């Protein structure tokens, strides 16, 4: 299918049979296509330096207590086992200095680093307030550490999710999405 605009032919897509499926295309004075993507900066380049992220939700601002509570409720509603882990700022991100390697291969843990577990996994936990009180206790004991909540599925024997519940006050790694782009 081709569209003729300003005496120029633009090939759209060969498989389109419905006119409604064809995107609106026009050519500006300089001869470039005007599409929705070109009108806004849809295709952005992310800053490759100091743009570290942790697992689920790491692209968002730090979660509030209410948002964490909703996530805990979701974890418990699915009968998953919550577990708290913490790590010092210099050990939180994967790197050659803090990864466990066995010869030329890395360990079998998902991201090659181990965080210290806070107590034991909360097997049989049915009340979200128990998890929230453990988060508060861990934060009080280690205020300058990263703390994440992970959950495990006992049936599939896998880690289902993991997300930060506390960033140290001294952390400078989080950047707003607008600041991550070039």
UniProtKB/Swiss-Prot annotation:
Keyword Transit peptide among record annotations: yes
GO BP of this protein: photorespiration; reductive pentose-phosphate cycle
Highest taxon in the source lineage: Eukaryota
Location(s) in or outside the cell: Plastid, Chloroplast
Main location per the UniProt record: plastid
Transit peptide: 1-41
GO cellular component, one term: chloroplast
One GO molecular-function entry: ribulose-bisphosphate carboxylase activity
Alphabetic keyword roster: Calvin cycle, Carbon dioxide fixation, Chloroplast, Photorespiration, Photosynthesis, Plastid, Transit peptide
SUPFAM superfamilies tied to this protein: RuBisCO, small subunit
Coiled-coil zones: none
Note: The basic functional RuBisCO is composed of a large chain homodimer in a 'head-to-tail' conformation. In form I RuBisCO this homodimer is arranged in a barrel-like tetramer with the small subunits forming a tetrameric 'cap' on each end of the 'barrel'.
Job of this protein: RuBisCO catalyzes two reactions: the carboxylation of D-ribulose 1,5-bisphosphate, the primary event in carbon dioxide fixation, as well as the oxidative fragmentation of the pentose substrate. Both reactions occur simultaneously and in competition at the same active site. Although the small subunit is not catalytic it is essential for maximal activity.
Family recorded in the similarity comment: Belongs to the RuBisCO small chain family.
Complex and partners: Heterohexadecamer of 8 large and 8 small subunits.
Name of the protein: Ribulose bisphosphate carboxylase small subunit, chloroplastic 4
Source species: Acetabularia peniculus (Green alga)
